[in-house]
Amino acid sequence: MFSLDNVLDDLWPQARPAPWQKKLLKKLFYEEEFQQFADRHRHLKGLDTVEQVLEYLNIRCAIPAHDLEQIPEYGPLVIIANHPTGTLDGLALLYAVSRVRRDVKVVTNRMLTHLEPLSSLFIPVDNIHGRTAKAALQQMDQQLQAGGVLIFFPAGEVSRLTRRGIRDKKWHSGFIKLAAKYRAPLLPAWINARNSALFYASTLISDNLPLLLLMQQMFRRRNSSLPVRIGQQIPWSNWFDAQSSARELTGRCYQHLEQLRKGLPGRFKTESAIARPEDRALLKRELHKAECLGRTADGKVIYLWQRNGQEDAPLLRELGRLREIAFRAVGEGSGKRRDIDGYDDDYLHLILWDEEDLEIVGAYRFMPTAIQLAKRGLEGIYSYSLFHYDGRMDDVLQHGIELGRSFIQPRYWGRRGLDYLWSGIGAYLARYPHYRYLFGPVSISGGLPPAARDLLVAFYRMWFPATHQLAESRRPYPASLPDVLAQFGGEDYNDDLARLKSLLGNLGCAIPPLYKQYSEVCEPGGVQFIDFGSDPDFNNCVDGLVLVDLTYLKANRYQRYIGAHLGAQKSA
């Protein structure tokens, strides 16, 4: 139960206010009204209480719908905001985030933890004595480790009246250290509000007096609107700089928020918000119209879908949304709301569907290139936009399938991963066995250190070289330098592979899963990396053009990916 006595005992245990002072403080704290509210809504907890408080006070959080879309649906996130009014700032941002996701907490003044129905949402810090308990620091750590949202008011105290107007006090840098630890994106929020003249006058008299007025300031905003602006998220790779101190990064974040307030471009490069998910029932209905190729070993359904001029295509929108989520998670992505391009209309989409959760597990975009050549010519083939083709590529184009834009959405990572995708490809090849080649661009994240990219390109050029120069990148990756090539002996594949893993490990990296998978599916000579090039339209990743000759497919891989579906087709 919220009471003045509890607050005083916790924050000012030495205080002995006179009866008349206590009576005044109870009024300033709206103790009676809080207790009546708590009695009336004792069944509510957490975010439900936040919504009810705002409804009770008739305060409307005026947040544009587009701004709400800036809040990512999953993954660790640090929201940084100015702190103009006090308690209401935290409630407004909790309410905003709850429209999108429920795993949110706010770092706030210890006094507010006495609002018991809301206490589960608060991580308390002691702004009065400038201390933060170890337990609170652990809570912050756990919140981001679990992939949740953490709201910070880096000023630590409510904004003050200055010569330049109402401004936050100097920001603390604690949020930078936590966000860096979990590589969390930052999301700036600007609350356009101010307190009363009485409040700002109190800040000139005492540091403690403004705290006593915070509840009064919240209640005075009854029957009003609280405008909130949420900016685009700043990916970790865009805000973090190992050469800068936490204090310097904090200053840049404050500058970025100030630019948001003014409606100007911020200090950091931002990303568009990822689009909201499509209706599950619509997706299920669309997939039931598609060709079913079979099932994976654990029951995921494999569908083959093509747009075929369909005007409204929720499946394609969802594929584009999930692609962008998966690619951003590994430092790639288009930076757009959905990763969709002009090739998606013509191409086939191999989709893995989880019937139980009504989720697209992952997908491959692909096209038998002979069909597309007859229909659109070379310009209709995606990889041709990245690589020039030699005439000797004709055999591959006539008897091959171009693969690309493969993804597994992050919630399914670590289960069967790429095995799902290869099972899907195998299901298609079991039904259409006359194709000999698989080929397409395979990316190395632009987020990897340059040294790691150089090592990967050098290794795959050395051990999976093109027998003929069938293609050449339009933006060639530089030739491997002698000192990079010298890292590998070139005589024993396994020794060099172990060396590559060790060198990448020293850089905090690993072999990209698709590169690992392609290098393992065939007998020697069955896989080639024809050329490598840079892709500025895809977050500056490196594209390697891989070519797989299916006649070299290892027997165990054939049985696992293709043979299993042949048996299923016969039994069907």
Write out the residue ranges for each language-model feature.
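Glycine-rich phosphate/pyrophosphate-binding loop shared by adenosine-nucleotide-utilizing enzymes
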Residues: 358-363, 401
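Non-catalytic C-terminal accessory region of glycerolipid acyltransferases
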Residues: 2-4, 103, 134-275, 485-491, ...
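Short amphipathic alpha-helix that is part of the acyltransferase structural core
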Residues: 294-349, 353, 361-362
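A short helix-loop-beta-strand connector motif used in the catalytic cores of GNAT acetyltransferases and
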Residues: 342-351, 525-528, 538-543
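Membrane-anchoring hydrophobic helices of lipid-metabolizing enzymes
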Residues: 1-80, 88-92, 99-101, 119-120
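Acyl-donor binding region in acyl/amide transferases
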Residues: 334-337, 370-526, 530-533, 541
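Glycine- and acidic-residue-rich phosphate-binding/metal-coordinating active-site segment common to enzymes
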Residues: 117-121, 127-161, 165-182, 187-193, ...
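Conserved N-terminal entry element of GNAT/NAT acetyltransferase domains
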Residues: 271-309
